[in-house]
Amino acid sequence: MSGLSPEQRRKSIGEIMFYMRNYSVPSLIMIFFAFAFIGWVWEVCLHLVMDGEFVNRGVLAGPWLPIYGCGALLALTLLKTLREKPWLEFLASIFMSGIVEYGTSLYLEWTHDGQRWWDYTGYFLNINGRICAEGLLVFGLGCMGIVYFIGPVLDSIFRRVKLKILTPICVVLIVLFSVDMIHSHDYPNTGKGITDYAVTGEEAPGGISQGMP
């Protein structure tokens, strides 16, 4: 922004941070993969710090946790009407995150012979070990950061990329992700630090990092 007047600089920042924007399909696709990757990095780092070892978190083989990407897209699109009311946005984000996480837990158990990739048993206000108050609070706060800051910034960045460049990137990512989904349906990612959580009243290893697939 060098060379811009203070007024032009404020206007440019305002455009970047405008959270009532409409997101294009290519931007939404890129945002999905961005947050799927960020979620994977988040959980890997938590496990690395708390347990001292690298673990490829999640059901899939690749460096992405799609539930984070889905949560980001739902927050940016379904909750737009609440954008001017942050407290309602926050509460709705918590409710939405609970539905997504609980539903994902049921789906994974149903499609993988009862196998669980996380268990919140023993956490405060947990429901069947699938969701808990602590996790939902974290995800609700995360959604607020996404809709009011990170999402608009990422969208502003992606809008600067020409469609003839952005479109092939989206296609390649979708193809790789689809292949991973198909492969992981029959050969899911399991093992130490992934599915070896506590199933009684004890906390899962890695704490809240066990909360997302």
Where are these regions (language model features)?
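Aromatic-rich, lipid-facing transmembrane alpha helices and their immediate juxtamembrane interface loops
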Residues: M1-P213
